Amino acid sequence: MVSNVKSFLNWSQSQLPNVLSPRLDSEVLLAHTLNLSRTQLRAQFDRVLSDSEKKIAKKNVERRQNREPVSQILGYQEFWSINFVVDKNVLTPRPETEILIETALNCPSPFKILDLGTGSGVLAIIM
């Protein structure tokens, strides 16, 4: 029976066999539901979840089962230590784009960058 953080994480992970990182996704989704960091979540494995917390968390797991990106479930994606709002209408910033920015910032100045609005706008904002 799912009653505390640890049992919910175990259940959630078992529900996500077709995602790349079921444990990570489970932790991120539950931490978000409880308004905790992942570190805080791990320190509270014995915390009993309320019925409303379980209901919201299970709904988020169902969304992830349907292959909805974690960032869209959360409503944001962290990029260069900044949270950017995302939804189904925005391309989620990818980690590979951070490498692109690091490479560009190491280029000799001056240089020009053109961002044609093909995503979330993180390139224009960060650069």
Where are the regions a protein language model picked out?
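Conserved SAM/SAH cofactor-binding pocket of Class I
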Residues: 95-127
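Non-catalytic accessory regions of SAM-dependent methyltransferases
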Residues: 1-36, 40-42, 46-49, 59
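Compositionally biased, low-structure terminal segments
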Residues: 9, 80, 110-112
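Generic signature of intrinsically disordered, low-complexity segments enriched in small/polar residues
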Residues: 11, 48, 82, 125-127
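Conserved AdoMet
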Residues: 31-103, 107
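A general structural signal for well-ordered alpha-helical segments in protein cores
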Residues: 9, 26-27, 57, 67-70, ...
